[in-house]
Curated annotation (Swiss-Prot):
The gene is rpsG. PROSITE patterns: RIBOSOMAL_S7. Belongs to the universal ribosomal protein uS7 family. It comes from Acidothermus cellulolyticus (strain ATCC 43068 / DSM 8971 / 11B). One of the primary rRNA binding proteins, it binds directly to 16S rRNA where it nucleates assembly of the head domain of the 30S subunit. Is located at the subunit interface close to the decoding center, probably blocks exit of the E-site tRNA. This is Small ribosomal subunit protein uS7. GO terms for molecular function: rRNA binding; structural constituent of ribosome; tRNA binding. It comes from the Bacteria. Keywords: Ribonucleoprotein, Ribosomal protein, RNA-binding, rRNA-binding, tRNA-binding. InterPro entries: Ribosomal_uS7, Ribosomal_uS7_bac/org-type, Ribosomal_uS7_CS, Ribosomal_uS7_dom, Ribosomal_uS7_dom_sf. NCBIfam families: rpsG_bact.
Length: 156
């Protein structure tokens, strides 16, 4: 382990259009191969699509979607003796937000709409309404943690 301790976390800068670090984090998750301007265009157009469809502030839609996708429990592998147990642990707030954004972008990419803008718009709207594959992923994660509750005493 380095003597200086862990590297400090860099703060996420707020984006210029909405002034929200969440939008910047979403842009960073959509970003591929350094094409930031393309990622920004996708995210901003998707958020405008949310505004057009719902008539509300897209930041509110994004926050509601994140709240519906954000996991509170997950399982971690822990080796005890010769066996590996799936131990349920609580998810730290920063990790839960990161996981939620990652899942939303991942399942948006798997959708069947023509453009990424449409896919992301629909995934955000579905997630904000408690539907969609990203919400199902959270439910599956919680179900897995609940079914392995017997191993909770192996927590570290």
């Amino acid at each position: 382990m380095p003597r200086k301790g862990p590297a400090p976390k860099r703060p996420i800068v707020s984006d210029p259009v909405y002034g929200s670090p969440l939008v910047t984090a979403l842009i960073n998750k959509v970003l591929q191969r350094g094409k930031r301007s393309l990622a920004e265009r996708i995210v901003y157009n998707a958020l405008e699509g949310c505004r057009a469809r719902t008539g509300t502030d897209p930041l509110i839609t994004l926050k509601r979607a994140l709240d519906n996708v954000r996991p509170t429990l997950e399982v971690r592998s822990r080796r005890v003796g010769g066996a590996t147990y799936q131990v349920p642990v609580e998810v730290r707030p920063q990790r839960s937000t990161s996981l939620a954004l990652r899942w939303i972008v991942h399942y948006a990419k798997l959708r069947r709409e023509k453009t990424m803008i449409e896919r992301l718009t629909n995934e955000l709207l579905d997630a904000s309404n408690g539907l969609g594959a990203s919400v199902k992923r959270r439910e599956d994660t919680h179900k897995m943690a609940e079914s392995n509750r017997a191993f909770a005493h192996y927590r570290w």
